[in-house]
């Protein structure tokens, strides 16, 4: 692959399309302990937690003292703790001054101004080169989709992810290695935000060029949708066995998609809408944190869980990127917007509230899906993937479905596959 092509955005070995048994991993049986353990006892953690308690408790004088101290100690260009403190401090300031809406709007506008196809591509490439944070879910999803749609002459993938199609070059490569005639692939990708129109156009052109190189008949459709993914017109995007799908085997790919839906019944409605599409498979990849408003009713608990999750994320970036990396800064600025939303935004409208593997599994099961175990072949591909990166990464199997990516023994990403459950027997 040419180094200047977007098709190089996913350089992992494509998963084997052959079927195999499900693979076995160590099980994490007590997620509550792992997820809710306090972050390491650094000065940043202690001061931020105390400041959050002062803000939520109305102790204005103490909150102001702590904010002044945190401002002196923090820096968006310092070490992990200084960077993290800077972003959480800004969110606490926005909360205390009731300026969350304007702060989120300003951060979003700044992100749009700095986003281009080249900057998006460069950040994605570099992040995948140095960390499995994204590629882990890509490899798991690709392998599961390839196996679920094996033998189908016409494949339709509805990609609801926010990863700018970076997982599909290796999927195209894997299709090209299959024996017999290459199947026709239709990729429908959903993009959010007006600033992404040009990015989507560039991505589509490069994917079409790469598909021609691989000898894969390929159709690409970009759908632009701002706001809640649950409000998409799913039937028009790809309705399983209906005319909208043209009889294709349908796969729905959700990488960091579901937590973009406001928590509660909206997420249940989203899962139910996916079930009505009658797909062969739905892949769900989500970052792991228990930030549901119904479970994080008090601000202190929600703040501590947000701090725990982003401490792990920033720590992984610290050990993967140079301190002055532009790509690292871009990833951290995106995290800053998420932190602002979680700390200062309205929980009922938040698009950043992650869940646990158990809670996502419960939603999928309630919507009429059954877990689809990842095969030995996919497990082998994931194991090989982690060997490419520095020490500290591992994986384990959570109950009841999927597999975890762990950073320093802490679950950070969950990858899973689901199939429609058979209808209940008639009474």
Describe the function of each predicted region:
Residues 1-427:
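Long, compositionally biased intrinsically disordered terminal regions
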């Amino acid at each position: 692959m040419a180094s200047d092509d977007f098709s190089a955005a996913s350089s992992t070995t494509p998963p084997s399309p052959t079927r195999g048994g499900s693979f076995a991993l160590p099980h994490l049986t007590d997620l509550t302990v792992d997820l809710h353990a306090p972050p390491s006892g650094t000065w940043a953690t202690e001061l931020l937690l105390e400041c959050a308690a002062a803000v939520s408790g109305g102790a204005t004088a103490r909150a102001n003292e702590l904010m002044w101290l945190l401002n002196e100690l923090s820096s968006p260009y310092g070490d992990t703790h200084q960077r993290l403190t800077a972003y959480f401090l800004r969110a606490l300031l926005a909360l205390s001054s009731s300026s969350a809406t304007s702060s989120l709007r300003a951060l979003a506008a700044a992100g749009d101004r700095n986003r281009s196809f080249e900057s998006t591509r460069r950040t994605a490439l570099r992040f995948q080169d140095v960390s499995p944070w994204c590629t882990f879910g890509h490899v798991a999803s690709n392998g599961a989709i390839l196996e679920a749609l094996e033998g189908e002459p016409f494949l339709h993938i509805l990609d609801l992810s926010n990863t700018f199609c970076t997982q599909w070059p290796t999927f195209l490569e894997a299709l090209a290695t299959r024996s017999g005639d290459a199947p026709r692939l239709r990729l429908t990708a959903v993009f959010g935000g007006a600033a992404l129109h040009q990015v989507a156009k560039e991505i589509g052109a490069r994917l079409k060029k790469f598909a021609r190189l691989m000898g894969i008949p390929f159709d690409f459709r970009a759908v632009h949708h701002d706001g809640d993914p649950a409000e998409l017109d799913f039937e028009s995007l790809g309705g399983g066995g209906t005319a909208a799908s043209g009889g294709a085997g349908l796969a729905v790919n959700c990488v960091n998609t579901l937590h973009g839906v406001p928590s509660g019944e909206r997420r249940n409605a989203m899962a139910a809408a996916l079930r009505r599409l009658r797909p062969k498979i739905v892949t769900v990849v989500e970052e792991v944190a228990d930030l549901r408003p119904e479970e994080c009713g008090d601000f202190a608990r929600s703040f501590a869980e947000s701090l725990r999750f982003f401490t792990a994320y920033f720590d992984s970036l610290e050990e993967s990127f140079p301190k002055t990396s532009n790509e690292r800064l871009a990833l951290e600025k995106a995290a800053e917007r998420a932190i602002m939303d979680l700390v200062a935004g309205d929980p009922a409208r938040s698009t950043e509230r992650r869940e646990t593997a158990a809670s996502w599994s419960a939603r999928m099961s309630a919507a009429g899906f059954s877990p689809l175990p990842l095969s030995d072949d996919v497990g082998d591909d994931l194991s090989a993937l982690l060997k490419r990166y520095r020490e500290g990464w591992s994986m384990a199997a959570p109950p009841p479905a999927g597999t975890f990516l762990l950073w320093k023994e802490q679950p950070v990403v969950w990858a899973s596959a689901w199939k429609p459950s058979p209808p209940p027997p008639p009474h």
